């Protein structure tokens, strides 16, 4: 795929008023979500749930793409249409999570590095033939006493850059996700410092690996107070700090930035995104790539009656997509 085609896909992913739904939970993660609402974690239930999400009527009004898990990209609708094929036909770009998860970084207590580079070229080639046009790799950066270390940040940046270069070689837009974790008692200033250092390292590594930024999307965490911090930053403070941090680290040539919800409530994640757009003068589109913050209310409703509430749960998904789509334009009213 040419640079022009990668850039075209990346731009479509951050089209005005549209975002990306993350439904790439691993089998173990979806097991926890299902258990919390009393759904049995079997393949057919996982398939049916993904069908509920992906076949929501008019979803493409506010959703440009969806990040899938390996199992999901191989599954079909109840009518026998592969999910990726269904999505493409309905204006939603198929994406695929390709990392193998974060593992302890040897010699660095409390720190993690994401694995999955071995054999990645062949996996990306297969995912492209299955219909994927973008991929996602998540790095995990914890904040704690004397962490993160520069070593941890550099190791994750290097892996993200190698992944991104392989994606572009195989015709997929790389979504790079260096998540600074919300857990902890740190204040918003500490989160800013860590996020800034992480993003500076990441874009340096992308440059060194000859990754074309015009065909790359950043999935960023917001600059926010730690969950157990006594003083929680306001919506305005989160928006201002996040935009300031991004402006100081992210090249303007990047097609766009989407945010992860990272454990924020549904309303917080929408309100923060909306507030960023009130600041104006943004060098790139800012949108969303939410998982739990898009799905949780619909999952609870569906669990009560998996047949009878199917359409009602889809309506909830559509409404959440609409709220976030409006927030991505700065037009959400709360």
UniProtKB/Swiss-Prot annotation:
CDD domains: FBP_aldolase_I_a. Keywords: Glycolysis, Lyase. The keyword Lyase applies. It comes from the Bacteria. One of its GO terms (molecular function) is fructose-bisphosphate aldolase activity. Its EC number is 4.1.2.13. Pfam families: Glycolytic. It is an enzyme of class 4 (lyase). The keyword Lyase applies. It catalyses: beta-D-fructose 1,6-bisphosphate = D-glyceraldehyde 3-phosphate + dihydroxyacetone phosphate. Belongs to the class I fructose-bisphosphate aldolase family. This is Probable fructose-bisphosphate aldolase class 1. It comes from Xanthomonas axonopodis pv. citri (strain 306).
């Amino acid at each position: 795929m040419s640079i022009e085609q990668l850039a075209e896909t990346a731009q479509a992913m951050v089209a005005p008023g549209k975002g990306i739904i993350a439904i790439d939970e691993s089998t173990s993660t979806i097991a926890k979500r299902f258990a919390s609402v009393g759904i049995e974690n079997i393949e057919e239930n996982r398939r049916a749930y993904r069908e509920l999400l992906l076949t929501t009527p008019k979803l493409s009004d506010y959703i440009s793409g969806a990040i899938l898990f390996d199992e999901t990209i191989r599954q079909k609708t109840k009518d026998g249409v592969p999910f990726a094929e269904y999505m493409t036909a309905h204006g939603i770009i198929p994406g695929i999570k390709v990392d193998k998860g974060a593992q302890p970084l040897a010699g660095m207590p409390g720190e993690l590095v994401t694995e999955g580079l071995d054999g990645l070229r062949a996996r990306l080639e297969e995912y492209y033939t299955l219909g994927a046009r973008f991929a996602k790799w998540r790095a995990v950066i914890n904040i704690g006493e004397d962490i993160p270390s520069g070593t941890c940040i550099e190791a994750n940046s290097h892996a993200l850059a190698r992944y991104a270069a392989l994606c572009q070689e195989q015709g997929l837009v790389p979504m790079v996700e260096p998540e600074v974790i919300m857990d902890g008692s740190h204040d918003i200033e500490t989160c800013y410092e860590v996020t800034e250092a992480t993003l500076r390292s990441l874009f340096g590594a992308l440059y060194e690996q000859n990754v074309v930024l015009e065909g790359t999307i950043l999935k960023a965490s917001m600059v926010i107070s730690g969950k157990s911090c006594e003083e929680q930053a306001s919506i305005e403070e989160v928006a201002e700090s996040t935009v300031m941090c991004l402006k100081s680290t992210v090249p303007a040539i990047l097609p766009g930035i989407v945010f992860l919800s990272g454990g924020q409530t549904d309303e917080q994640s929408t309100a923060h995104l909306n507030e960023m757009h009130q600041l104006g003068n943004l060098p790139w589109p800012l949108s969303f790539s939410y998982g739990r913050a898009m799905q949780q209310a619909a999952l609870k409703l569906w669990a009560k009656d998996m047949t009878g509430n199917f359409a009602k749960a889809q309506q909830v998904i559509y409404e959440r997509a609409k709220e976030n789509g409006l927030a991505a334009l700065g037009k959400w009213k709360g």
